[in-house]
């Protein structure tokens, strides 16, 4: 169940980040509201995850996968450009997250 919580947290973090970009500095009501609601849900489920998984694995997975998925959203929805260094860095993040989850410590 903790990984379900983590998936929900990561997903709502990515949604919240997309809303945040769309809110244009909180000047648009609906995207601003979406940002607040999404991040509220995100942190609720992140805290539920931390009740079951170690902080180091939880946070590294949340931050790493959130960054990767946010990058994908920024490319697809906002038409932002990336370069080779960005791609290599994302691959390294994925390798790090997978390694932590396979070989990292548990309680």
Curated annotation (Swiss-Prot):
Could you tell me the membrane topology recorded for this protein? Multi-pass membrane protein
Matches recorded under SUPFAM superfamilies: Multidrug resistance efflux transporter EmrE (SSF103481)
Q: Which GO terms describe its biological process?
A: glycine betaine transport
Its Gene Ontology cellular component terms are: plasma membrane
Asked if the Swiss-Prot or TrEMBL record annotates the protein with the keyword Lipid biosynthesis, the reply is: no
Location of this chain's protein in the cell: Cell membrane
Supply the InterPro entries for this chain. Small_drug/metabolite_transptr, Small_multidrug_res
Task: Give the primary localization class.
Answer: membrane
- Transmembrane regions: 26-46, 57-77, 84-104
Quote one Gene Ontology molecular function term: amino-acid betaine transmembrane transporter activity
Instruction: Give the similarity note.
Output: Belongs to the drug/metabolite transporter (DMT) superfamily. Small multidrug resistance (SMR) (TC 2.A.7.1) family.
Q: What does this protein do?
A: Multidrug exporter. Is implicated for the resistance to bacteriocidal quaternary ammonium compounds.
What is the name attached to this protein's record?
Quaternary ammonium compound-resistance protein QacC
């Amino acid at each position: 169940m903790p990984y379900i919580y983590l998936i929900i947290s990561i997903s709502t973090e990515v949604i919240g980040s997309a809303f945040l970009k769309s809110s244009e500095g909180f000047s648009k009501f609906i995207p601003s509201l979406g940002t607040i609601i999404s991040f509220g849900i995100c942190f609720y489920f992140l805290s539920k995850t931390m009740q079951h998984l170690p902080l180091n694995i939880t946070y590294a997975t949340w931050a790493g996968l959130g960054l990767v998925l946010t990058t994908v959203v920024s490319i697809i929805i906002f038409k932002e450009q990336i370069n080779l260094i960005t791609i290599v860095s994302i691959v390294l993040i994925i390798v790090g997250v997978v390694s932590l989850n396979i070989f990292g410590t548990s309680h």
